[in-house]
């Protein structure tokens, strides 16, 4: 997958379905009192025909209200940091960082349901999957018409340890499947976790001020 596409990739009603209620209860339990998360991820991207485009893995960290860190370790390194005001995308092998203002794309990420569950019904139509899949309870999220989202549909899969998987399908049918592990709740983040400072010799593209 092209590097620029990586980034395009971070309920109030009562429902009758037992499976859906279980998934919502899992979400509510997982997010109750949540201020930050730190864990590992593995990611697979496939095209509309199911062909694998990329496998990758690394570390993810999230913190309220609008901070995140995606640190790809394999197959090559890339760092994406959102500090609440700006988003930095650093490619070490290119010695280049791209920076831009943090906007609606981050706020409309399906992961926003973890650190700000109140947005769930405001931004998505939430539906149930017919039955558990991969041993998980799933919530399907479809962006509402007036939501500026970069995907067509997302699914969150919950197990006994909370969020275990996330699947995202974009406008051209490309599917991104992410598995999470080793979640640490409300960790004591290092001061620079959600901060990026360009190193010596790094080209800065965009407005870093």
From Swiss-Prot:
Keywords per UniProt: Chaperone, Periplasm, Protein transport, Signal, Transport
Pfam families (alphabetical): LolA (PF03548)
SS bonds (residue pairs): none
SUPFAM superfamilies tied to this protein: Prokaryotic lipoproteins and lipoprotein localization factors
GO biological process, one term: lipoprotein transport
Main location (coarse class): periplasm
GO cellular component: outer membrane-bounded periplasmic space
Subcellular location as annotated: Periplasm
Cleavable signal peptide: 1-21
Subunit structure: Monomer.
Alphabetical list of HAMAP family matching this protein: LolA (MF_00240)
Function recorded in the entry: Participates in the translocation of lipoproteins from the inner membrane to the outer membrane. Only forms a complex with a lipoprotein if the residue after the N-terminal Cys is not an aspartate (The Asp acts as a targeting signal to indicate that the lipoprotein should stay in the inner membrane).
Family from the record: Belongs to the LolA family.
Name assigned to this protein: Outer-membrane lipoprotein carrier protein
Organism encoding this protein: Xanthomonas campestris pv. campestris (strain B100)
């Amino acid at each position: 997958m092209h590097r620029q596409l990586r980034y395009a990739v971070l309920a109030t009603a009562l429902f009758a379905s037992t499976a859906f209620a279980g998934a919502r209860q899992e979400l509510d339990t997982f997010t109750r009192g949540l201020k930050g998360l730190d864990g590992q991820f593995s990611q697979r991207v496939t095209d509309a025909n199911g062909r694998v485009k990329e496998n990758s893995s690394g570390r993810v960290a999230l913190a309220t209200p609008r901070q995140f860190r995606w640190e790809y370790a394999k197959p090559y390194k890339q760092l994406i940091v959102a500090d609440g005001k700006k988003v930095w995308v650093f490619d070490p092998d290119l010695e280049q960082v791209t920076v831009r203002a943090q906007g609606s794309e981050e706020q409309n990420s399906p992961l926003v349901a973890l650190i700000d569950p109140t947005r769930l019904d405001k931004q998505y139509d939430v539906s149930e999957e017919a039955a558990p899949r991969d041993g998980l309870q799933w919530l399907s999220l479809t962006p509402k018409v007036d939501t500026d989202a970069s995907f067509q549909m997302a699914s969150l899969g919950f197990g006994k340890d909370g969020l275990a998987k996330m699947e995202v399908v974009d406008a051209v049918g490309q599917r991104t499947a992410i598995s999470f592990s080793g979640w640490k709740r409300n960790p004591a983040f290092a001061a620079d976790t959600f901060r990026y400072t360009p190193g010596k010799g790094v080209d800065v593209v965009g407005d870093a001020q």
